C-alpha cells in the first residue's frame, strides 16, 4: 500500500511530467489561458492518460511480449492512445457539448501529447505491473492537471497585471512556468 502511495505522490508532485520531465508542454502552454479550459483539458487528459496507460500495459503484456513484437511497442501505443482519444472525444461530445466546443482542436491533440506516450513507455521501462501502471498513469494525469490549472490561474492574474512590454505574452508565461518548476522542486525530499 505504501508503494502505491509513493507512486502517486512521486508522479503528482516530485517527478511531475510537465515541470520535471518536460512532457506535455504543448497543451501546457496552449490551453492555459483560462482556468475553465485548463480544467476541461485536465479532466479529458486525466481520463485519456489513465485509460491509455492501462490499455498500453495490457497490449504490451498480452499481445506484444508473448509474440516477441516489442519493437512495435511505440506504434502500438500510439494506436491505443488514438483509440482512447477518439472514445473520449465521443463521450465529451455527448455529455458536454459546451466543453467539446471550448476545447476545440485541443481534444484531438491529446493524441499527440507526448506525456501520454511517455507514461506508456515509462511503464514498460520501469516494469510496472497492472496496478502500478494504472496508478502511474493516474498520478501523471493528476500532476498534469494540477500544474495546468495552477498555471492557468496564474496566467489569468498576470494578464490583468502591469507587465513590462518586453515580457508580455509567452515571455512572462515561460518565466512563470520556470518559477512554478522551482516551487515544485521543494517536493523533492518527499520521495527517495
Swiss-Prot record:
InterPro entries the UniProt entry points to: Ion_transpt_RnfA/RsxA, NqrDE/RnfAE, NqrDE/RnfAE_oxidrdctase
Membrane topology category: Multi-pass membrane protein
Pfam families: Rnf-Nqr
Entry's transmembrane regions: 5-25, 39-59, 65-85, 102-122, 134-154, 171-191
Keywords, comma-separated and alphabetical: Cell inner membrane, Cell membrane, Electron transport, Membrane, Translocase, Transmembrane, Transmembrane helix, Transport
Keyword rRNA-binding recorded: no
Record-listed E.C. numbers: 7.-.-.-
GO biological process, one term: electron transport chain
Entry's Gene Ontology cellular component terms: plasma membrane
Subcellular location: Cell inner membrane
Summary of subunit composition and partner proteins: The complex is composed of six subunits: RnfA, RnfB, RnfC, RnfD, RnfE and RnfG.
Function comment: Part of a membrane-bound complex that couples electron transfer with translocation of ions across the membrane.
Family of this protein: Belongs to the NqrDE/RnfAE family.
Stated name of the protein: Ion-translocating oxidoreductase complex subunit A
Amino acid at each position: 500500500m505504501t508503494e502505491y502511495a509513493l507512486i502517486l505522490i512521486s508522479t503528482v508532485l516530485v517527478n511531475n511530467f510537465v515541470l520535471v520531465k518536460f512532457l506535455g508542454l504543448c497543451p501546457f502552454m496552449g490551453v492555459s489561458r483560462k482556468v475553465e479550459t485548463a480544467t476541461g483539458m485536465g479532466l479529458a487528459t486525466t481520463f485519456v492518460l489513465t485509460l491509455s496507460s492501462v490499455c498500453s500495459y495490457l497490449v504490451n503484456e498480452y499481445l506484444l511480449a508473448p509474440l516477441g513484437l516489442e519493437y512495435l511497442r511505440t506504434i502500438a501505443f500510439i494506436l491505443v492512445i488514438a483509440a482512447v482519444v477518439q472514445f473520449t472525444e465521443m463521450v465529451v461530445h455527448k455529455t458536454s457539448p459546451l466543453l467539446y466546443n471550448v476545447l476545440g482542436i485541443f481534444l484531438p491533440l491529446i493524441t499527440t501529447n507526448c506525456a501520454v506516450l511517455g507514461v506508456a513507455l515509462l511503464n514498460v521501462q520501469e516494469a510496472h505491473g497492472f496496478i502500478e501502471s494504472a496508478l502511474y498513469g493516474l498520478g501523471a494525469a493528476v500532476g498534469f492537471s494540477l500544474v495546468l490549472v495552477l498555471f492557468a490561474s496564474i496566467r489569468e492574474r498576470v494578464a490583468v497585471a502591469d507587465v513590462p512590454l518586453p515580457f508580455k505574452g509567452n515571455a512572462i508565461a515561460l518565466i512563470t512556468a520556470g518559477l512554478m518548476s522551482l516551487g515544485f522542486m521543494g517536493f523533492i525530499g518527499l520521495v527517495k
